[in-house]
Amino acid sequence: MSTKPLFLLRKAKKSSGEPDVVLWASNDFESTCATLDYLIVKSGKKLSSYFKAVATNFPVVNDLPAEGEIDFTWSERYQLSKDSMTWELKPGAAPDNAHYQGNTNVNGEDMTEIEENMLLPISGQELPIRWLAQHGSEKPVTHVSRDGLQALHIARAEELPAVTALAVSHKTSLLDPLEIRELHKLVRDTDKVFPNPGNSNLGLITAFFEAYLNADYTDRGLLTKEWMKGNRVSHITRTASGANAGGGNLTDRGEGFVHDLTSLARDVATGVLARSMDLDIYNLHPAHAKRIEEIIAENKPPFSVFRDKFITMPGGLDYSRAIVVASVKEAPIGIEVIPAHVTEYLNKVLTETDHANPDPEIVDIACGRSSAPMPQRVTEEGKQDDEEKPQPSGTTAVEQGEAETMEPDATEHHQDTQPLDAQSQVNSVDAKYQELRAELHEARKNIPSKNPVDDDKLLAASRGEFVDGISDPNDPKWVKGIQTRDCVYQNQPETEKTSPDMNQPEPVVQQEPEIACNACGQTGGDNCPDCGAVMGDATYQETFDEESQVEAKENDPEEMEGAEHPHNENAGSDPHRDCSDETGEVADPVIVEDIEPGIYYGISNENYHAGPGISKSQLDDIADTPALYLWRKNAPVDTTKTKTLDLGTAFHCRVLEPEEFSNRFIVAPEFNRRTNAGKEEEKAFLMECASTGKTVITAEEGRKIELMYQSVMALPLGQWLVESAGHAESSIYWEDPETGILCRCRPDKIIPEFHWIMDVKTTADIQRFKTAYYDYRYHVQDAFYSDGYEAQFGVQPTFVFLVASTTIECGRYPVEIFMMGEEAKLAGQQEYHRNLRTLSDCLNTDEWPAIKTLSLPRWAKEYAND
């Protein structure tokens, strides 16, 4: 029997003319409801005259009725406040107590003396007072003493700068609804961005307020850092892997220019076009701009490869237009065939630090006014990376690769092991290479930067054709015998035109002993300034892992469809499903700096799964094999949702967030698919719904979901769980005291007033839940969630599973509520602690067991013995 008193109210229907009735008792909800119904009938009134009983906050008053006795006069004196949970005295009414004194409490103590020492909540004060209370505090200030409150009012005019007070008053509608925790973080980060607010601009402060509160919770830390650097960004752009894509800093594009993925694509296309003609990247000719748009529309290599690399690169939007154009323009021909080489190349040439004022040499390279090579990162020995090492004349790439393979890496393991004569040979080759580069540089200086030619010639040059007055006749690629691909193709015989090798859109790497330069056509390298730096470079023979990896999603659906597959919760998931903490989980996410142990109500489902912390689903992988935890990080995920998953997701939304159901799902009407008119109506309906982004469920599925929901509401405790005030999809973070690992969970619903946790499940066979829960490790979920709740609230909650059947029985969809026994909960607690220790050991030793041992099943052993 519950020791906590429960106060019930049954409102009377207006048509009945009966008064409302209340009852309180130290019992559970169902027993108290039954007692109330019995006493109403016993008093001669009809149950049909009243609505169903609801639980409210327990009132603390003098004229409380006796326990177990109904009171029909209670509503004459008291009424529910706006939250529909707290009782308050009606205006003009007085408690029904002859000994009532307005200045004493229920214990007869003088409230005047007590109120002198009471802590007053800060939430009810004016916004400037709440702001000032959080200023300079490491933790949120929720209550202050009476003297402290007076001090805040006195210090309001002195300690709160006028510009801050004005900004707060201008954004009252935006700041006033904030909880104390959120307001404290805003005050803290505002102090970081504007340490001297008296010298700050009012517009900047209000702009920061808007950007900060409009940003996702997990992006506010990065947003604050960007503002501290002077980058007045309005939001944080992220790459596909979740890293910060940048773009908020000032570049050579000009102040106020919004640099996004579209402008980045134009810069990359400009670099591709700059390979065949000289451009003014800051003042494009209309013909050049038209050709750039065509390159973007074609979306072919090398443009598509370089664009994707800049998009997935952390901070890829920070670079200037000059460095982007120059890096694409000067990239080795054909490097896009192996995307990993593009990543390696960009890591070497993107050396820019002042994005607003790029190096003049880089600008000249981008505009075609200089033929100097791209500056690259300098190694510890003071030399550029291997990409700029020239190759001795007469040595092929294969020979050099073989030599480097047979010789140990002396630079890495030994110091100064190269003979002096070998060093002099390298120096002489380097001098020859630099001499060739200088000659080409001088030749290009004599070419006019702009030629008065028509658009047709410009477009012809952009296609790689030689055009008088535009193309450089001294360029090695125009030497005698070397023509464009179009010219070569036109001059070939008909039999050669149909050769399979000529249909290759891009150069194909052949396994030949000698490699020909794409610019000069010669083998061996060092025949022109271009092949000296590229041909035979051993650096380009290695394959490097790409930095961006596909983020795999963990799956732990709460469905038990088909209990014969006890581990089908890892089969797939919907990233937008709100039914579970484990659904759509993203492994190895970007670490969110501001997440600290506590409970958060405003984190979206997607950002929760992209945040840090170990979840119950990941513990399931550790329990299976630790390597499965790593595998799930890297394995691709098929995000196609099954029909069963859509039904389960819709049911969870209907139960937990009914107000969101219409925003996420559309119940289709019934169509007569036997007729052409019905098929056309269905097709038109689906096309209309496709633009909404909502999930369409059939009329039969919608009817089934509603029946399942009504089945839940028909169960008294189920109705109480659904209607009780609580929080759905809240996120709880805590640290495991034994291993120090950050843990997290996302309960379907918590009811803090009574310390209950509800988890909604659907199953095809509700009877098997009593035994199949162990295969699904729901006892581990119970213990894991309960310990997380206790870490936040200091109380072990009552954890229940509300299980709804998707299979009809006797015309109804069964609904039952289960609770783990003490033995099962203890076993789950021991199990998840064992999993955390295993994870801790794997992280410390970097050893992840992956092999599973297969044993003969019982029937096979019996067969072998026969």
UniProtKB/Swiss-Prot annotation:
Q: Please tell me how industry or biotechnology makes use of this protein.
A: Has been used to construct a 2,4,6-trinitrotoluene (TNT) biosensor strain.
Which molecular function term from Gene Ontology is one that the record holds?
A: identical protein binding
Could you tell me which InterPro entries the record lists for this protein? ExoDNase_VIII (IPR010584), PDDEXK-like_dom_sf (IPR011604), Put_RecE_PDDEXK-like_dom (IPR024432)
- Highest taxon above the source species: Bacteria
Q: Where is the composition biased (Polar residues)?
A: 417-426
Which EC class, in a word? hydrolase
EC number(s): the record gives 3.1.11.-
Where composition is biased (Basic and acidic residues), the residues are 562-580
Spell out the residue ranges making up region: Disordered. 368-426, 545-583
Q: Which UniProt keywords apply?
A: Exonuclease, Hydrolase, Nuclease
What inducers act on this gene?
Answer: Transcription is increased specifically in response to 2,4,6-trinitrotoluene (TNT) and its indicator compounds 1,3-DNB, 2,4-DNT, and 2,6-DNT.
Tell me more from the record: Encoded in the Rac prophage.
Listed under subunit, the entry gives: Homotetramer.
Q: What biological function has been recorded for the protein in this entry? A: Is involved in the RecE pathway of recombination. Catalyzes the degradation of double-stranded DNA. Acts progressively in a 5' to 3' direction, releasing 5'-phosphomononucleotides. Has a strong preference for linear duplex substrate DNA and appears to be unable to initiate degradation from single-stranded breaks in DNA.
> Protein name, please?
Exodeoxyribonuclease 8
* Organism, scientific name: Escherichia coli (strain K12)
